[in-house]
Amino acid sequence: MKIYELAKEVNPYVVEMRRYFHEHPELSNQEDRTIERIGQELAGMGIEYEVVPHGGIVAILEGKTPGKGKTVLLRADCDALPVQETKENLAGPRVCCSKVDGVMHACGHDGHTAMLLGAAKILKEHLDEVHGRIILFFERAEENGGGIPQMLAYMDEKGLKPDTVWGIHLYAGLESGKMGLLDGGTMASVFGFNVTIHGKGGHGSRPDQANSPIDCFVAIYNALEAARLTKITPFQPLTVSVGLLQAGAVGNVIPNDLTFAGTARFYDRDLVGMPFRNYFFQMVEGIAAAYGCTVSYNSITEPAFAVSNDPECAAFARKVIGEELGNDVIAFPEPWMASESFSQLQKLWPGVFALLGINNPEKGTGAAHHNEYFDLDEDVFKLGVAGAVTYALRFLDGDVDTSSRQWKGSVRDLFTELGVKPEVIDSYYKAIHE
């Protein structure tokens, strides 16, 4: 079976699907039209599927023979972002544009979904080569993490336990035609915060009679910056940023309140994420008290897991994909400090998250993710399709045993580890029956 040749043959279909999804982007938790179209495409291939309410779509391909009894999960995300797309990318006019004002696929999820549909098409047409089971996993709301809980609850209820998971992200930080297959940390974990400082407002001429939340925030911000040097091990990366700041309306009035929000990114949850989280609360509340202020937490995203490739699975992927596509395709980029809900899949089941380069200056596809100039190099889709199919088929036939490295607890235990309250966990399981 010449997988790369099959990927080339299916590439026009993948491009067509990508352009459809790009022209009709939908925000997180609103991907109804997208999910409907994915279902239509799967049905047209003769693949049965189930729509997971608030989660996405799960389909199962049973091979002609059970082989070694293994299961591989292939995943794609499908939501867009609230970004106003430009008519041109970095080099000139785009091949397709969003038809939805203020919404665009600015992170490549349109390509991810299209590539998984292409892989599904090949696998369905060659079930005699599938010696085991393959799960197709189309996830809603990756950008805000709103789809993965319901998808995992569904997997739990159905007793679906893959031996390995595969995901891929189109990546502007890597040149087109290269596929990053790293051992260990590939994308970062995130701790998110949205906090309001409550002070005492007053006239701008008498700051001595006010407790300015702005002064309080300045001290908090400086402490956040210093944390990287004084509170966290210097041998692990940490980035901290504040992207939202709201306070006051005019220059001569000290406001009562100030709201700030941001994120911290890291690779090691235990050595960096949890220590930073604990320091954050102590520091914010301590400084607020010193400035005569109080704080309220509008939202807190507890430290998640990093995307971390299982070394044995990653080495296997490099070997088999190198054999299929050529070793010159394999690359070792620096880990990416962005975050991904795929980390939860990897925490349960060892696997690989590949970074597929799309940076092509001639085509103008090098803009950063979540940027209005972001665009995809469609020529690389065949590599992504071939990579997914190759990993799946060769893993089913191979000797990689991940049983000792799988999550030892339940899916509910995983949610608990992430700081999710029991009643919220229950809501995930209820949601999939709505």
Give a label for each model feature:
Residues L81-V83, R94-M104, D110-G111, L123-P255, ...:
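Histidine/acidic-residue-rich, glycine-tolerant segments that coordinate divalent metal ions
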Residues N11-V14, I35-G39, L116, I214, ...:
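Hydrophobic face of alpha-helices
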